[in-house]
Amino acid sequence: MGIAESTPDELPSDAEEQLRSGDQQLELSGRRLRRLPSAVCALSRLQKLYVSGTGLRELPEEIEELRELRILALDFNKLERLPDGLCRLPRLTRLYLGGNRLLALPADFAQLQSLRCLWIEGNFLRRFPRPLLRLVALQSLQMGDNRLRALPAELPRMTGLRGLWLYGNRFEEFPPALLRMGRLHILDLDRNRLGGFPDLHPLRALRVFSYDHNPVTGPPRVADTVFLVGEGAVERMAERDEPTPRPPPRRPARAFEDEEEEDLLIGGAGSRALGAPGGSFRALEAAPGLGT
């Protein structure tokens, strides 16, 4: 059976049935859509919109009409740019943009002041998008598998950040700004080009540090409460006086419900391991979160 394809301006035939559930959500994942049907933007009460793995190439400016939208999944598509209208969604808390072709984010992206969880892994970002620095409420930032070489000195402005995933980038030195991110719980620098680390004791809230697949000869100096993943980690943790902490999940799983803050740092398989979706990601179960 082939993937259903809708005409550009019409809602799929089953959309009305979905909306009648009263949950104000629309699942379009896995369909063949080059652009979002214009009728979707007329659903002014919509709160959850899933458009993953559809081949989507563009979004209309009219997406800003979805003023009640809280969750927007656009991952595994072919988006090269985002419209300014997407930046005018005042209630948006979760945005999934992984696996697209994005080189940058719009300057107005900083208007998304309700955003708490952003996945933008698997794109073509060479520089850290500066609009993100103004998202002080953002708690979970997934930027793995991009092309970053450095982080801005102003990164500590993101005082709400608790989980930062930077695996699969091109860092050759540990970014100095990270040493001033004292509220981070999870830091993932797998698969970079790091040859060493500074003393990481300044990261007092750190609970998980992953540095696997880097050209380092041993683990960094960290507090005994930090779970390490990488060369020499098992030996280092075995030397501790206290029992080795139970490892919290390192990679965030997809979660589409409006959980509390602690559930934004949930664990499980990252989206890069899932491949293009054939349907909804909502079937994935959320693991227990890491509290603040």
Swiss-Prot record:
Matching PROSITE patterns: LRR
Region (Disordered): 1-20, 236-261
Superkingdom in the source lineage: Eukaryota
Sequence ranges of Acidic residues compositional bias: 7-16
Claim: Transferase is one of the keywords in the record: no
One Pfam match: LRR_8
SUPFAM superfamilies the record matches: L domain-like (SSF52058)
UniProt keyword annotations, A-Z: Leucine-rich repeat, Repeat
Repeat region (LRR), residues: 22-43, 45-66, 68-90, 91-112, 114-136, 137-158, 160-181, 183-204, 205-226
UniProt xrefs under SMART domains: LRR_BAC, LRR_TYP
InterPro entries: Leu-rich_rpt, Leu-rich_rpt_typical-subtyp, LRR_dom_sf, LRR_domain-containing
Record-given protein name: Leucine-rich repeat-containing protein 10B
